[in-house]
């Protein structure tokens, strides 16, 4: 979450008058994240989150995100629920941006994920995948392999400002992943596509909620697992933690076993996931709006993760032996 668009107090008061959520007591911008402008609202009826969707998010996609949250919540997944205004609408406009109010979830995200946290997110991800099977709406993944070339084009001219040689490193990896190696015949379904630690809340050792479905889409289920391996299983010194990976994968496969093809493809999917976040971080790093209340994330973190994944020989390198499982 982040703040790119500020909101005047009188404009916010007029906006909130359309909702039955009590009187506004205070509000503040939330600086974490990189995609949209988010505010914590404190009203006489509790806490809510106000999101203003910025330009990277297409307005036509917003009904998908909002309906998905409702579907998952109805299916027993702890996630925010959209709040409708007095006319039953969950999507509105504020400060020239599409806007929505969602319920507030208790819990905190883990700044230093433990093995227990990794097991929790593995289980939660699998349950979300299963709950999404009967969600009728569809949305293609605009940031899968076909979407990486435009990101590279947007950043290549200045990539070497971040690290000398970065442009050529990215070009080589992108060419490889575009060469026909990317799988298309693995089990597909609804994926979160951005399940980083700051998008999972815990109370103690238990997952209390999954947030931020801005990138949710239909794609390879194992790709979502690969994203989590990169996001949860590396230490602050960039070393891969096999114990965390084993916990995450074991918890996931207890709920939804990976078939043999998914297992074989996981290292390649993790390479692609690393490149995808490296590219979006690089574009954001080079294009932070002046004065924005935002903390751009370091693209070099994902250079190191990509280099690791390039050298993974198979799923055993993630600490597990689950060959023969069936979906």
Curated annotation (Swiss-Prot):
Kindly give the HAMAP family that the UniProt entry links to this protein. Answer: Homoser_kinase_2 (MF_00301)
CDD domains cross-referenced by the UniProt entry? HomoserineK_II
What's its catalytic activity?
L-homoserine + ATP = O-phospho-L-homoserine + ADP + H(+)
The family line of this record is: Belongs to the pseudomonas-type ThrB family.
Q: What is its EC number?
A: 2.7.1.39
User: Pfam families attached here?
Assistant: APH (PF01636)
Q: Which InterPro entries match?
A: Aminoglycoside_PTrfase, Homoserine_kinase_II, Kinase-like_dom_sf, Pseudomonas-type_ThrB
Q: Which UniProt keywords apply?
A: Amino-acid biosynthesis, ATP-binding, Kinase, Nucleotide-binding, Threonine biosynthesis, Transferase
Pathway terms, separated by semicolons: Amino-acid biosynthesis; L-threonine biosynthesis; L-threonine from L-aspartate: step 4/5
Citing just one GO molecular function, the answer is: homoserine kinase activity
What is this enzyme's class at the first EC digit?
transferase
Domain of life assignment: Bacteria
Q: Which GO terms describe its biological process?
A: threonine biosynthetic process
User: What name does the UniProt record give this protein?
Assistant: Homoserine kinase
Keyword check for Amino-acid biosynthesis: yes
